[in-house]
A protein has these predicted regions:
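Sec-dependent signal peptide recognition
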Residues: 1-8
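N-terminal signal peptide c-region/cleavage motif recognized by signal peptidases
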Residues: 13-15
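N-terminal regions of proteins, emphasizing targeting and processing segments when present
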Residues: 8-11, 32
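Serine-dependent protease modules
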Residues: 18-298
Length: 298
């Protein structure tokens, strides 16, 4: 009898644990179609360096050396003017994005489409469209692109301010080109500032993000986009549990300016501010290390 009771309690605990885990299937089915794969092609011209040969007379003692070791007819050989023909090749890259309006406007990261000569957007129904960049902002890593299509499925937007640390979130994207891949995790922190990014209060998560996920959406459990997956912190180049997303309200403010005025307008207060450390507080005779110090006036 006791064994039966133990087994029953064990099965009950398993059932309770399973019920406590989130189910993402409905979210993916409803909103996954608004996530796209982005591929770019960039034409790169690489100039070949020619040997730097001084202009020497035939009676110069080094003339024979350069004549022998630089092939005849090659630019740079005595008597052969000109430079080598530049070498051209294509650079291809992959990223993710998502549709924000039914008439073909999409958001992605600026670094996904930077310097691209051709941008191709692939929908989940396998249709492909050429896209053009409406505008981009390197400081926030946001780009607004457009495809010529209508009746598209668009995402719903949420409020990142309402996110709580520990809340479940989900990412959809194309890591390493594997389209419509779904990963999930929790919000690890809010308002993170990275050394190279002074304009973005990042959402930190432990959602698995890899190359190709950049520009894809971060969903809350209500199926609303709360961020754009942008970068990871890693010592190896691979995912190590530290992912960072741009809050969607920041992204929408940027895209609104790009769409309406074509550029980003930012205010400046003309001062450089730094955090008051314990050492600074002691040197100024402060009771606690709090507040901010105006370090310089521009």
């Amino acid at each position: 009898m006791s064994r039966i009771l133990v087994v029953a309690l064990f099965l009950f605990s398993l059932g309770a644990s399973a019920q406590g885990l989130p189910d993402f299937t409905e979210l993916v089915e409803k909103h996954g179609a608004a996530v796209v794969n982005i591929s770019t092609t960039t034409q790169i011209t690489q100039r070949r360096g020619a040997p730097q040969v001084p202009q020497l007379d035939e009676d110069d003692p080094f003339y024979e050396f350069f004549r022998r070791f630089i092939p005849r007819g090659q630019p740079g050989q005595p008597g052969q003017p000109g430079q080598p023909a530049p070498r051209q090749f294509e650079s291809r890259s992959l990223g993710s994005g998502f549709i924000i309006s039914a008439d073909g406007y999409l958001l992605t990261n600026a670094h996904v489409v930077e310097a691209a000569d051709e941008i191709t957007v692939k929908l989940t129904d396998k249709r492909e469209f050429k896209a053009k960049v409406i505008g981009s902002d390197k400081r926030t890593d946001i780009a607004l692109i457009k495809i010529e299509a209508t009746g598209l499925p668009a995402v719903r937007l949420g409020d990142p301010a309402k996110l709580k640390v520990g809340e479940w979130v989900l990412a959809i994207g194309s890591p390493f080109g594997f389209e419509s891949s779904v990963t999930a995790g929790i919000v690890s922190a809010k308002g993170r500032t990275l050394p190279s990014e002074n304009f973005v209060p990042f959402l930190q998560t432990d959602v698995a993000i890899n190359p190709g996920n950049s520009g894809g959406p971060l969903f809350n459990m209500r199926g609303e986009v709360v961020g754009i997956n942008s970068q990871i912190y890693s010592r190896t180049g691979g995912f190590m549990g530290l992912s960072f997303a741009i809050p969607i309200d920041v992204a929408m403010d940027i895209q609104n300016q790009l769409r309406t005025i074509g550029k980003i307008s930012r205010g400046r207060i003309g001062v450089v501010i730094q955090e008051v450390s314990k050492e600074l507080a002691e040197s100024f005779g402060l009771k606690s290390a709090s507040g901010a110090l105006v370090n310089a006036v521009e």
